[in-house]
Curated annotation (Swiss-Prot):
NCBIfam families: RdgB/HAM1 family non-canonical purine NTP pyrophosphatase
Chief site of localization: cytoplasm
The gene coding this protein: Itpa
The protein, known as: Inosine triphosphate pyrophosphatase
Organism: Rattus norvegicus (Rat)
InterPro entries: ITPase, ITPase-like_fam, RdgB/HAM1
Sites where the protein binds ITP: 14-19, 56, 72-73, 89, 149-152, 172, 177-178
Length: 198
């Protein structure tokens, strides 16, 4: 499947300009396909993260009638059995980063993990959707740093004193869940030389 996509345009399903910018920055100029952002209204699927990613990708490929890349991000609180998980977008809209932190007020365990899944389809419904996952463990903390990128202010990756929002973008882009998932996508296309050395 990788060979059939080389040199082609892949629609990256997002309406978020910051997300597109981050993905392109992480993939770098050796990535053999051109990503073109397109906002597509997809149903809000429910289920486990992999199921949601596959369903979203299949529906996006059906609408685009060609190759698509869909990203799904989860923020999973261990004390809450993995919630909010794939529903983080809705929790964040209602609660803001402060509310996410307050959700864990009654729990000693503030550990969490950020999970990013990229789902890739050639656009051919007979071909399986491929999944590329990245996971970063961390803690949910009182929000700190810039407020321009989702829940970044309240997620502090393990081994760091800063939240994602406080980190320079270049540093975040070498440790984040999104970076780890995109690294696997790069490996699939055989273009990782040096990508993991940042």
């Amino acid at each position: 499947m990788a060979a059939s996509l080389v040199g082609k345009k892949i629609v990256f399903v997002t309406g978020n300009a910051k997300k597109l910018e981050e993905v392109i920055q992480i993939l770098g100029d050796k990535f053999p396909c051109t990503l073109v952002a397109q906002k597509i209204d997809l149903p809000e699927y429910q289920g486990e993260p992999d199921e949601i990613s596959i369903q979203k990708c299949q529906e996006a490929a059906r609408q685009v009638q060609g190759p698509v890349l869909v990203e799904d991000t989860c923020l999973c609180f261990n004390a809450l059995g993995g919630l909010p998980g794939p529903y983080i977008k809705w929790f964040l809209q209602k609660l803001k980063p402060e509310g996410l932190y307050q959700l864990l007020a009654g729990f000693e365990d503030k550990s969490a993990y950020a999970l990013c899944t990229f789902a890739l389809s050639t656009g051919d419904p007979s071909q399986p959707v491929l999944l590329f996952r990245g996971k970063t463990p961390g803690q949910i903390v009182m929000p700190r740093g810039s407020r321009d990128f989702g829940w970044d202010p309240c997620f502090q990756p393990d081994g760091y004193e800063q939240t994602y929002a406080e980190m320079p973008k270049a540093e975040k882009n070498t440790i984040s869940h999104r970076f780890r998932a995109l690294f696997k996508l790069q490996e699939y296309f055989g273009v990782t030389d040096g990508a993991g050395d940042h």
